[in-house]
């Protein structure tokens, strides 16, 4: 299994250039590039071609653009903006050699019926699939374990991607989001491992279902999530591609960028290596 770094882990104590430097130094294979902040910040002082050259001349490679945010159940203007943003991402993927775009469902306090969420998600993902196909890019849908997210359990997200039924549309499996809204391990056991494109590893403090938020995440293996169950099940269903460490903990942002990146690797490898060669 390959090791990836998700830039949320150093959101407030680093930038893309430093993330790349330290991830390369500490032996990461991939990086998920944050398109809402770290990439635009980088492009203020660098050309995209410089980033492409960096990846061509170093071990670390770009795994995903993270993320196309709130893709479903938008009004007409919002939908057009999503499509245009995604088309721009395709050109970035082409230049950098990025394999995936992470797509995050709408977060809202508005109550939307599940059938309407599914219908919109399937329609938009099918449209995105058509756009991505010529580029060879895959779409990884990330359900979010918050009550306000329109797609917040594994079973709901899996049903959507199976209904889309495209080879280039699958899931991000995030241990925090799976745990946070009480997703069922039995549902994961029945899933096709080929429909999981990226595994986000993390852990969390032990708050009740519905109360957990991203800032509650802790180093893998140091919290309440049964990561052994997640990893053993992922192995059983045939997933073995890439693990990406993604934390949002404010106290970790007070560390140096290098210490955060080094500790993220050490804690991830310690947990994952019981089940996968990494």
Swiss-Prot record:
Cofactor(s) the record lists: a divalent metal cation
Catalytically driven reaction(s): scyllo-inosose = scyllo-inosine
Pfam families in the record: AP_endonuc_2
Gene Ontology molecular function: any one: isomerase activity
Co-factor binding comment: Binds 1 divalent metal cation per subunit.
UniProt keyword annotations, A-Z: Isomerase, Metal-binding
Protein EC: 5.3.99.11
Family annotation (InterPro entries): IolE/XylAMocC-like, Xyl_isomerase-like_sf, Xyl_isomerase-like_TIM-brl
Domain of life assignment: Bacteria
Its biological purpose: Involved in the reversible interconverion of 2-keto-myo-inositol (2KMI, inosose or 2,4,6/3,5-pentahydroxycyclohexanone) to 1-keto-D-chiro-inositol (1KDCI or 2,3,5/4,6-pentahydroxycyclohexanone).
Family from the record: Belongs to the IolI family.
Protein name, per record: Inosose isomerase
Natural source organism: Bacillus licheniformis (strain ATCC 14580 / DSM 13 / JCM 2505 / CCUG 7422 / NBRC 12200 / NCIMB 9375 / NCTC 10341 / NRRL NRS-1264 / Gibson 46)
Organismal lineage: Bacteria, Bacillati, Bacillota, Bacilli, Bacillales
Gene (name only): iolI
């Amino acid at each position: 299994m390959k090791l990836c770094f998700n830039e949320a882990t150093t959101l407030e104590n680093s930038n893309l250039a430093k993330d790349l430097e330290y991830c390369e130094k500490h032996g990461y294979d991939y990086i998920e590039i944050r398109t809402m902040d770290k990439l635009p910040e980088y492009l203020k002082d660098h050309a995209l071609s410089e980033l492409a050259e960096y990846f061509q001349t170093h071990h670390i490679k770009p795994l995903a653009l993270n993320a196309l945010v709130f893709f479903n159940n938008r009004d007409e203007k919002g939908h057009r903006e999503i499509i245009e943003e995604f088309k721009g991402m395709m050109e970035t993927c082409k230049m950098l050699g990025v394999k995936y775009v992470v797509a995050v469902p709408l977060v809202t306090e508005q109550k939307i019926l599940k059938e309407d969420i599914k219908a919109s998600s399937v329609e938009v993902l099918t449209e995105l699939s058509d756009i991505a196909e010529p580029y060879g890019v895959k779409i990884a849908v990330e359900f979010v374990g918050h009550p306000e997210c329109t797609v917040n359990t594994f079973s709901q997200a899996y049903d959507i991607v199976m209904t889309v039924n495209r080879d280039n549309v699958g899931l991000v499996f995030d241990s925090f989001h799976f745990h946070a809204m009480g997703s069922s391990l039995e549902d994961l056991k029945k899933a096709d491992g080929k429909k999981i494109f990226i595994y986000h590893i993390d852990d969390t403090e032990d708050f009740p279902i519905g109360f957990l938020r991203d800032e509650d995440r802790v180093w893998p293996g140091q919290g309440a999530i049964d990561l052994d169950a997640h990893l053993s099940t992922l192995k059983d269903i045939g997933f073995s591609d890439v693990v990406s460490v993604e934390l949002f903990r404010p106290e970790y942002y007070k560390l140096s960028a290098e210490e955060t990146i080094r500790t993220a690797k050490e804690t991830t490898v310690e947990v994952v290596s019981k089940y996968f060669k990494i």
